[in-house]
Amino acid sequence: MKHGCLILSCASMQLALPLESILEVSRMVAPCAKLLRVPRYVLGVVDFHGQLVPLIDLPARLGLCPPRSPEALIAGHIAFIELPSGLWGMAVDGVHDLINEQMEPLTIEPRHLVGLVLGSLRVSATERALVLNPGRLLSVVARARIGAELSELAKPPERAGGPA
């Protein structure tokens, strides 16, 4: 079992994801397809070892910045995470460090992140990173919409015309 957290930069904040949910981290790549009827923070899908995985602009999803284009994130990274609902790619502005410190509970959760935070970690003498709850990053409705669009994308194209 993996322990600790990966420190990420999301817009101007330092956040963390628990290592047990992270499969791999890679440099940002352009999506290979767009999804249509999904929230604006969904950038499209990327190929992860032969599987199409939805790519989420994590800072935009958290309300830390407006939705961005893949080009605006070209210097960023993708944290591929595995949840009970499947594989997801989380586009972030930067990846900094692995920390194996004790997580501390929050006394007050930031209003825009209520229910999304597990606790906080000390990153330095003056900085803390909020530890996100990966299972709560996407709502049930958003997961359903994204799943429906992925299913549409996976369908074979219909042939024009009828039987000959």
Place the predicted regions along the sequence by residue.
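An acidic, low-aromatic, low-complexity terminal/linker signal
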Residues: M1-A164
